[in-house]
């Protein structure tokens, strides 16, 4: 095919004998020119079905050769440039009609011999995800124990992290058992069950659960683990019920005698009424000593916050610390100096109204760290 390309002659001038440029466009499907004398008919293309209904096919096998789409591709088959239909999955050939396309005839491949096409419209699609059944026991065992290269390279790091996590969990378990015995002096028969319950509660609190949900989830987890163990080891109903009652007794004792503060540290149980009373007393003491002028005042307010983590939430404690222990105090007559001295702390600030840089001298009492 020849396409003339018209050039813009307004931008530059041509020579006298140049009239235009022609470029040939060649396409992959363009038939070559034939001879006038060769009017012979070519051999047949062997069209028609190559696999019939119910025959087994492998991936890539041609099922139908045709000119045009006499048959349309159905499930698990593809169609080529010459409209040949071929299998995309190993299975059984099915010729069928689709009620959603009543004027078309389809060819598909069923993945199993008991499956019929078309598949039910609202049912899940049957897929292999590139897998096939291994009948050889040795090959099946090898496949079960094989891992990808990416997982193989990451395996040492994963095992190391698991060891670190297990060691941290063991340290936390020892720490909690020491607190239960030495500080709280609780008479607990199964200390391992108690520490495992407290670790689950602490993890739930760390993930943002309320204390009631954390306790419920921890108790439910331990009970479910015990039921699964009983099923594996074929326990009797009496033994299982006795084990579950131990979990209930231990969790009830811990819920009524222990609690976690906002730093996730175990301490003596404090009721909600006691927490509100301690919070009100703390606010009253903080209001009395609002003005920080000396190091003694700073240490006094810090001492008030010493046990605040036991009855305040983390957000409440942070809010109160930012309010009463400000790192930089507001600019007042007592903290702003008219002249800068040797002990003054000078800062420069741009004044947009006056359009100039102001030099502000402040005393050391204006900064909490300098008291």
UniProtKB/Swiss-Prot annotation:
One of its GO terms (biological process) is mitochondrial cytochrome c oxidase assembly. Keywords: Mitochondrion, Ribonucleoprotein, Ribosomal protein, Transit peptide. GO terms for cellular component: mitochondrial inner membrane; mitochondrial large ribosomal subunit; mitochondrion. Transmembrane segments: none annotated. Present with 2300 molecules/cell in log phase SD medium. Belongs to the bacterial ribosomal protein bL27 family. NCBIfam families: L27. This is Large ribosomal subunit protein bL27m.
């Amino acid at each position: 095919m020849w396409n003339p390309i018209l050039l813009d002659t307004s931008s530059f001038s041509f020579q006298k004998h140049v009239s235009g440029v022609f470029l040939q466009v060649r396409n992959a499907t363009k038939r070559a020119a034939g001879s006038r004398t060769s009017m012979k008919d070519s051999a047949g293309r062997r069209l028609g079905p190559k696999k019939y209904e119910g025959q087994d096919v492998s991936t890539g096998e041609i099922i139908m050769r045709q000119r045009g789409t006499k048959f349309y591709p159905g499930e698990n088959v593809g169609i080529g440039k010459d409209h040949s239909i071929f299998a995309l999955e190993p299975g059984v050939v099915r010729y069928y009609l689709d009620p959603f396309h009543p004027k078309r005839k389809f060819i598909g491949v069923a993945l199993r011999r008991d499956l019929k096409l078309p598949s039910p419209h609202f049912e899940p699609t049957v897929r292999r995800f590139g897998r096939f059944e291994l009948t050889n026991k040795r090959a099946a065992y090898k496949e079960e124990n094989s891992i990808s290269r990416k997982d193989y390279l990451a395996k040492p790091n994963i095992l190391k992290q698991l060891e670190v996590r297990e060691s941290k969990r063991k340290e936390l378990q020892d720490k909690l058992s020491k607190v239960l015995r030495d500080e709280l002096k609780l008479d607990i028969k199964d200390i391992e069950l108690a520490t495992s319950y407290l670790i689950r509660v602490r993890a739930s609190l760390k993930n943002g659960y309320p204390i009631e949900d954390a306790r419920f989830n921890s108790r439910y987890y331990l009970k479910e683990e015990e039921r699964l163990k009983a099923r594996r080891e074929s326990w009797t109903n009496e033994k299982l019920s006795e084990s579950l009652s131990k979990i209930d007794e231990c969790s009830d004792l811990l819920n009524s005698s222990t609690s976690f503060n906002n730093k996730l540290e175990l301490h003596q149980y404090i009721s909600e009424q006691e927490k509100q009373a301690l919070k009100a007393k703390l606010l009253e003491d903080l209001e009395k000593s609002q003005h920080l002028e000396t190091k003694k005042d700073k240490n006094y307010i810090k001492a008030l916050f010493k046990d605040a983590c036991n009855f305040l939430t983390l957000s409440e404690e942070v809010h109160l610390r930012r309010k009463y222990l400000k790192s930089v105090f507001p600019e007042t007559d007592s903290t702003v100096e008219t002249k800068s001295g040797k002990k003054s702390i000078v800062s420069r600030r741009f004044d947009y109204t006056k359009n100039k840089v102001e030099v502000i001298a402040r005393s050391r009492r204006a900064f909490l760290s300098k008291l």
